Amino acid sequence: MAEVKEYKQLNGLALAYMGDAVYEKFIREYLLAAGKTKPNQLHKTATKFVSAKGQAVALKAMIAEGFLTEEEDRIAKRGRNAKSYTVPKNTDPGTYSMSTSFEAVLGYLYLAGEMERLQEWMEKALEIVEKGVETN
């Protein structure tokens, strides 16, 4: 695997790009391990976790709980303030910016090699989104 030496200098969108892939892989593995194997079922369930709304809900709850370190908070702000010139048509800009923020932190943790903390983040997000899914 190629090492990204200057990951601390990457902009929020580049970090989010990496974080998106890391989180998508985590969720797919989680769903397969949970015994979900039908393609339609996999897609519908995965979307609840990897959607901008799901990620924004998770990050807001994590911030409210004081889960973020100072460094993670700084990276989250960098992701949230990143200027994206496209916003998906089914997502409002605020939600999209929070999800970019969430993904930026995951990307940063991954590139920094902080795998234990990355795992904590993804498990916490999973727990938060699952609770939201159960109550809806």
From Swiss-Prot:
Its main location: cytoplasm. It comes from the Bacteria. GO terms for molecular function: ribonuclease III activity; rRNA binding. InterPro entries: Mini3_fam, RNase_III_dom, RNase_III_sf. GO terms for biological process: rRNA processing. The active site is at D20. It is found in: Cytoplasm. SMART domains: RIBOc (SM00535). Keywords: Cytoplasm, Endonuclease, Hydrolase, Magnesium, Nuclease, Ribosome biogenesis, RNA-binding, rRNA processing, rRNA-binding. It is an enzyme of class 3 (hydrolase). Its cofactor is Mg(2+). Belongs to the MrnC RNase family. Involved in correct processing of both the 5' and 3' ends of 23S rRNA precursor. Processes 30S rRNA precursor transcript even in absence of ribonuclease 3 (Rnc); Rnc processes 30S rRNA into smaller rRNA precursors. This is Mini-ribonuclease 3. It comes from Listeria monocytogenes serovar 1/2a (strain ATCC BAA-679 / EGD-e).
